[in-house]
Amino acid sequence: MLRGISQLPAVATMSWVLLPVLWLIVQTQAIAIKQTPELTLHEIVCPKKLHILHKREIKNNQTEKHGKEERYEPEVQYQMILNGEEIILSLQKTKHLLGPDYTETLYSPRGEEITTKPENMEHCYYKGNILNEKNSVASISTCDGLRGYFTHHHQRYQIKPLKSTDEKEHAVFTSNQEEQDPANHTCGVKSTDGKQGPIRISRSLKSPEKEDFLRAQKYIDLYLVLDNAFYKNYNENLTLIRSFVFDVMNLLNVIYNTIDVQVALVGMEIWSDGDKIKVVPSASTTFDNFLRWHSSNLGKKIHDHAQLLSGISFNNRRVGLAASNSLCSPSSVAVIEAKKKNNVALVGVMSHELGHVLGMPDVPFNTKCPSGSCVMNQYLSSKFPKDFSTSCRAHFERYLLSQKPKCLLQAPIPTNIMTTPVCGNHLLEVGEDCDCGSPKECTNLCCEALTCKLKPGTDCGGDAPNHTTE
C-alpha cells in the first residue's frame, strides 16, 4: 500500500513534465500547418506509395538514365484516404520541364552578368490525376514529400508535407477563394502598329502535309526573366524562387499538354542587382521597354518566347500583356504581374498570355469548358484553368496552318549534339532567322531563301498586336 501511495506523486509529477512536451509537439505541428486567408486545413493524410513494375525494371531491375541511376521514377502512385474515401494519385514525371541546356543568370553587385548551368538538375515534378476520375488533375512535386495541387470531385486541394518524406503525415488544404467579380477583371486588346490583319487559311485545310503538322508533338522553349521586385519578394533566396518557378512550369504543362504542347524552361534570368529596364505600373510601358530589351539580347539564349515576371502591381487591374500571333519571332514576349505568391493564379495569367501568342483570342465569360474554367476566359477566375474552349482550339489550329511556326516542332535538345543547320529544309535551326524552303518554294516576303536571313529593310518583327489582360 505504502509503495502504491508513494508512486502517485511521481506519476503526477511525470504528467506535469510531459504536458509541456506534448504542448511543444502540438505547437510544432500547428506551425507546420500554416493556414492562409486563401487556404483552410482540411485534414491530415498519410500517403502510401504503391509499387509499379516498370518495363525498365523488368529488363534490368533498375531505372537508369544514360548509365546513371535515376533518383525519381518515371511514374508513381500514392494511395491515401481523403474525406473517408480511398483515392490514388497516379502521376507521371513531366517531360521537358527543363531544357537540356537550362541556364540561370544573376548579376553581381557590380552589375556583372553571371550565367551558370546548374549540375544535377534532375527534377522531381509530376503531373497526372486521381485514378479513375476523368476530369481530375494533379501537379505534384516529390522532392521532399508530396507538395502541390490536385482536384477531386471538382474541389481544389493543396497538399504539403509535415515532414520531409512522402509517406508520413501531410496536410491537405482546400481553397477559400471565391470566383472573382467579372467587373474587376476585364481583358482588352491593344494593337501597337495594326499591321497584322486577320489570319487567312488556304482552302486545302486537310492536305496530308497540314494534317501531319497538326498531329505533330509541339514544343515551346520558354525564357523567364524575373525583375528585382520579384527577387526581393522572395527574400533574394534562389532556392525558394527556383522551387516556385518549377511549380508554376509544371502547372503550365498540365494546361498545355491538353493541346499536345510541351513547354520547357530553357533559362531563368534574375535581375538581382536592379532592373535592366524601367519597370513601371503601366503594363503597356513596361511591355514596350521589355520588348526593346529583349530585341537587343536575343543572342543570350535560344528560345521561342520570353516572359517578364514582375513583383510590382500594374495599374487599372491589368495583370498581363502579350504580343499576339508572335511565337518564334523577336516580338514574342509578355509581361506578367507576379506580386502575389500564388502559383495557381500566376499560371492562369501566364497560360492566358501564351494563348494569345499562339493566336487564341479571349472568350466570353460564360463560355463553358469541361473543368468549368477556360484558359482564355476574358475575365480571370480563381479556378485552375485547365481547358481550352472549342473556339480557341479552332483558332490555334488556324494559327498553326497559316503561320506554320517551325520552332514549335523542335524538341529541346542539347546544343552540343545539334546538327549543322541546313538552309532550305523548312526547319528553323541555330543561326537562322527564317527558313522558307528553297528559292522556288519560298513565299515569305521577309525571308532570304538562299541565306535564311531576314531581308534588309523589311519590318517583319515587332508589329504584332498586343493582348492585355486585366
UniProtKB/Swiss-Prot annotation:
Induction: Induced during DC maturation and up-regulated in response to T-cell signals. In macrophage up-regulated by bacterial lipopolysaccharides (LPS). Up-regulated by 1-alpha,25-dihydroxyvitamin D3 during differentiation of primary monocyte into macrophage. Zn(2+) binds at H352, H356, D362. PROSITE patterns: ADAM_MEPRO, DISINTEGRIN_2, ZINC_PROTEASE. It is found in: Secreted. The active site is at E353. GO terms for cellular component: collagen-containing extracellular matrix; extracellular region. Expressed highly in the small intestine and appendix, moderately in lymph node, mucosal lining of the colon, thymus, spleen and very weakly in the bone marrow. Predominantly expressed in dendritic cells (DC) of the germinal center. Weakly expressed in monocyte and highly expressed in macrophage. Absent in immature DC. CDD domains: ZnMc_adamalysin_II_like. GO terms for biological process: immune response; negative regulation of cell adhesion; proteolysis. Pfam families: Pep_M12B_propep, Reprolysin. PANTHER family: ADAM A DISINTEGRIN AND METALLOPROTEASE DOMAIN, ADAM DEC1. This is ADAM DEC1. It comes from Homo sapiens (Human). The gene is ADAMDEC1.
